[in-house]
Structure formats: structure tokens, C-alpha cells
């Protein structure tokens, strides 16, 4: 073969190889990176790990349906260690890796520290659980979005349970001493006043997030003889189970009432029989209507069980829904840009989600009804809606 023909032949082979490679790239587009920052170690570590599993289960469902903008989702998970400085470091790390969205926020102090960092980077930030009202104040992130009930919403639901469910007059508070705990207690007391409920605060004990020994505090509460003791503790892996056990061991009189979203099956599993009798309020239960018969929720529950052998609790549903809302908005608007997606979610409505058909308030707060429950024989027994 002469040199000219050989050159054209090699060029043809190269072109064919390039075309073949381009075809492969078209079939396997680059994934869209989704960042997740939650506690994966320490007291809240088990719950953070479960939420991460739920997000991965939802990612699998979304990818099977075509992904986001025709591209698969790749979930990058980081441990914030329930520490603000670590959360900020993890946020910067994920931003550097080019994530399109960050799903974060178990602890309010950590979420509040991360918010301005993520906002300055121009990355969409969806807060899952951090319930401090400051999360949606606009100071750290003017385009904030949150799924879990706010302190105000949770406080109103707990106040309703105190006033109408238990008709408690003598109230004791066992409160986590941070933005979440203090804000939640203030919201509960504001809710009681809004209901014109006549009550007396007979005891108030505060503690740090990492505390697991509440015997001295509960001894003081026992001496106050409360009708209802409100436990406000976001450390569901360590602190809340300890409160349940020590409350029963200390023979504290009256009803133990947990703040919204702080008693899940994982908490009950750790606390054992001491969890029986505790009351609370929450926003999601996988096997209770209207969720039990919802086809979208059923698919999510089935996928979570298949992938991780775990039935989702409220924490897991919130994590999955955060990814779902983002994916729905991105596919609808055909963009990954932070501002249009945030404006679509804030004040917007979505059909066919894990939570059913839902809406967000203009400030970015997901609007969901709450349901009162008690724990009996190691299981959550839902009573009736406690408010919206």
C-alpha cells in the first residue's frame, strides 16, 4: 500500500474509533454529582447512615426512570461528625468536586454554619432536618429550602398534644442547649400561650447535644412532680434512647412527650421496652394512611427494603424526598442552575412524591400535617392529626 493510501486508511480507522467512542459516551453520559452531608458517626451516626441509604434508594429509582436531564445521579456522601467546622470543611470538599446540589442538615448549628458557604458557591442547598427557625431566615442562604417541620411547626404540634391530648398543667422541659433545643422549647411555650392553655413550668433542665447521662436532671424533674415532661433531643442514636431508659428507671411521674421527629423505630430499637408509653408527633409513617397505599411511597419502601433490608422511617423518607424534589424540578425546568430550581421549589407544588401531593411555603418550608402517636409493645401507634 502506498503511503498516501496508508495515511487515509489510518485516518479512517481513527475516525471510526472516534465515532465508536462518541457513541459510547452518548450511551453513558457523565453522572450528575449529588452531595450529602450528614452525621455518619457519633450519637446520630446510625440515623445519618439510614438517611444516606434512603437517598441512594431514591437515586436508583430516579436513574431507572432516566435520571436527571438524561444523566445518572452519583451520590457523594460525607460525615459532618455533628460539628459545625467539620460540616463546613465537608461542604467545601463537595463544592470542589463539582456537585450540583447538597443535601444536608441534621443538626441546626451545623446546617447554619454550612449555609453561607454553600450559597456563596452558587450550589443549591436543601436542608433536611435542622429545624431552627434561623435556617429559613435568609441570612445564611436567601434561597433556603427545608423539609422537616420548623421549630414553630413542631412546637405548635407538641403544644396541641399537651393541651388537648394530655391536658397537662405542670410541665417540665428537658432541653438540648443549642439553637434547635432552645428554639423548640420557645415554640412549644408560644404554642401553649396561643391555645390559651393555663400551665406552669415546674422544671427546666438543659444539656449539650453529646450528653447521655440525664439521671441528675431527671431527679430534679421527678421532684417537681410534672404532668408532662417534654424531651427535646436531636441525638436520636444516643441521647434520646438514654432519656427513655432513664425516665422509666427514675420513676418520673407523668407523661414523657418527645419533640417532633425525635422518636423513630431506630430509637425504639435502642431503648427497648423503656420506649413503651412515650408519646410524640411526626410527619411520616410508612405503613399508615395516606402513605401506606400511595404508589410512589410503596415503590420507595420496596426499593429501600430490597437494597438495604430496612423499612424507611421518617428520617429516611425526608432524605429521599429531598433528592426527589430536586430531580423533579431539574427535569421540569431542564436546568441544574441553583436560582431557578430554588424558585421552583420555594412556594411550589409537587405531585407524586414520597409524601404524596405537597406544597412548599414561599420561604422554602415544606408543608406537611403532623400526627400524634404513642409507642406500645415496641411499635409506633398513630392516633390522629395533631395540626398542620
Model-derived regions, located:
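Periplasmic-binding protein-like
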Residues: 94-106, 126-128, 172-175, 225-236, ...
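N-terminal secretory signal peptides and thylakoid transit peptides that target proteins
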Residues: 1-15
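Extracellular/periplasmic Venus flytrap/periplasmic-binding protein
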Residues: 88-89, 133-134, 142-251, 289-299, ...
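Extracytoplasmic "Venus flytrap"
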Residues: 31-54, 78-85, 106-107, 174-183, ...
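Extracellular/periplasmic periplasmic-binding protein-like sensory domains
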Residues: 244-320, 379-387
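Segments of small-molecule ligand-sensing domains
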Residues: 303-317, 325-380
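Beta-alpha junction/loop-to-helix N-cap segments that form part of ligand/metal-binding clefts
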Residues: 46-53, 61, 68-138, 207-214, ...
Amino acid at each position: 500500500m502506498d503511503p498516501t493510501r496508508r495515511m487515509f486508511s489510518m485516518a479512517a480507522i481513527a475516525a471510526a474509533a472516534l465515532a465508536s467512542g462518541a457513541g459510547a459516551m452518548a450511551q453513558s453520559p457523565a453522572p450528575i454529582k449529588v452531595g450529602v452531608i450528614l452525621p455518619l458517626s457519633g450519637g446520630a451516626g446510625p440515623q445519618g447512615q439510614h438517611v444516606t441509604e434512603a437517598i441512594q434508594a431514591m437515586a436508583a429509582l430516579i436513574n431507572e426512570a432516566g435520571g436527571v436531564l438524561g444523566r445518572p445521579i452519583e451520590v457523594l456522601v460525607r460525615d459532618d461528625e455533628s460539628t459545625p467546622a467539620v460540616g463546613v470543611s465537608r461542604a467545601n470538599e463537595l463544592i470542589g468536586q463539582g456537585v450540583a446540589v447538597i443535601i444536608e442538615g441534621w443538626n441546626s448549628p451545623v446546617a447554619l454554619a454550612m449555609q453561607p458557604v454553600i450559597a456563596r458557591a452558587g450550589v443549591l442547598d436543601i436542608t433536611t432536618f435542622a429545624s431552627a427557625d434561623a435556617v429559613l431566615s435568609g441570612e445564611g442562604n436567601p434561597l433556603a429550602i427545608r423539609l422537616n417541620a420548623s421549630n414553630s411547626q413542631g412546637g405548635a404540634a407538641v403544644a396541641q398534644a399537651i393541651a388537648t391530648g394530655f391536658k397537662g398543667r405542670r410541665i417540665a422541659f428537658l432541653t438540648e442547649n443549642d439553637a434547635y433545643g432552645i428554639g423548640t422549647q420557645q415554640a412549644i411555650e408560644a404554642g401553649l400561650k396561643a391555645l390559651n392553655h393555663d400551665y406552669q413550668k415546674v422544671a427546666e433542665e438543659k444539656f449539650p447535644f453529646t450528653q447521655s447521662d440525664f439521671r441528675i436532671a431527671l431527679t430534679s424533674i421527678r421532684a417537681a412532680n410534672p404532668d408532662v415532661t417534654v424531651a427535646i433531643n436531636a441525638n436520636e442514636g444516643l441521647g434520646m434512647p438514654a432519656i427513655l431508659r432513664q425516665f422509666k428507671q427514675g420513676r418520673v411521674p407523668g407523661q414523657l412527650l418527645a419533640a417532633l421527629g425525635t422518636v423513630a423505630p431506630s430509637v425504639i430499637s435502642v431503648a427497648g421496652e423503656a420506649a413503651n408509653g412515650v408519646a410524640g408527633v411526626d410527619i411520616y409513617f410508612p405503613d399508615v394512611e395516606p402513605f401506606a397505599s400511595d404508589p410512589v411511597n410503596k415503590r420507595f419502601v420496596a426499593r429501600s427494603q430490597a437494597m438495604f433490608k430496612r423499612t424507611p422511617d421518617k428520617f429516611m423518607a425526608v432524605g429521599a424526598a429531598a433528592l426527589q424534589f430536586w430531580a423533579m424540578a431539574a427535569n421540569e425546568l431542564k436546568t441544574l442552575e441553583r436560582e431557578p430550581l430554588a424558585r421552583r421549589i420555594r412556594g411550589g407544588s409537587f405531585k407524586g412524591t414520597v409524601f404524596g401531593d405537597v406544597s412548599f411555603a414561599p420561604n422554602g418550608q415544606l408543608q406537611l400535617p403532623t400526627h400524634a402517636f404513642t409507642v406500645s409493645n415496641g411499635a409506633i401507634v398513630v392516633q390522629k392529626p395533631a395540626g398542620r
